[in-house]
Amino acid sequence: MGGRMEYRVLGKLDVVRDGDEVDLGAHRQRSLLGLLLTNPNTVWSTDRIIDSIWGDEIGSDRQNALWVYISGLRKALEPDREKRTEGTILLTRSPGYLLNVEPDAIDAVRFERLVAEGKALIDSDPDAASLVLGEALALWRGRAYEDFAYEAWAQSEIARLEEMRLEAVEARVDADLLRGMSRELVSELESLVREHPLQ
């Protein structure tokens, strides 16, 4: 049962189990998983989930739809789970649900950890700092939560991660400058200034 799971939000949302991409279903079902990944290992109330996913939308049985999406995600994430059992990933916890994942299984969490490690190394070991920050930046496959760019629940998390991405690039540039690589950085710095003129 199970296997190694990777949850990727630094680009289009996807989940990889033992090297194979998991079919996460319809957009709203994927949106539910994306929402839960913004704060994993925390109980989300059903009311908070419904408000986040559906907002003020009228005309649907949102409680029933949520149950259908939870069921669909459970099947997708744990296909070997016995019927009518909860499994170990998407758990029912009063007053709602909890996504139980190892933090390092989420690319955004790994990214944050690597950025902190890289920044801490800049002054003492700029070579190692550049390497670690490069590893962090390599986790990005597009814009954070790319397929949910227009959904209200994702906006603050997208902004937070994109800001951290820019900080990581700046920190890697600082490390590379300390390594004496100023010539190699000219085109990258010009591109950064064009993309972020107010930074």
Whereabouts are the PLM-identified features?
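Intrinsically disordered, low-complexity protein-interaction/activation regions
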Residues: 1-199
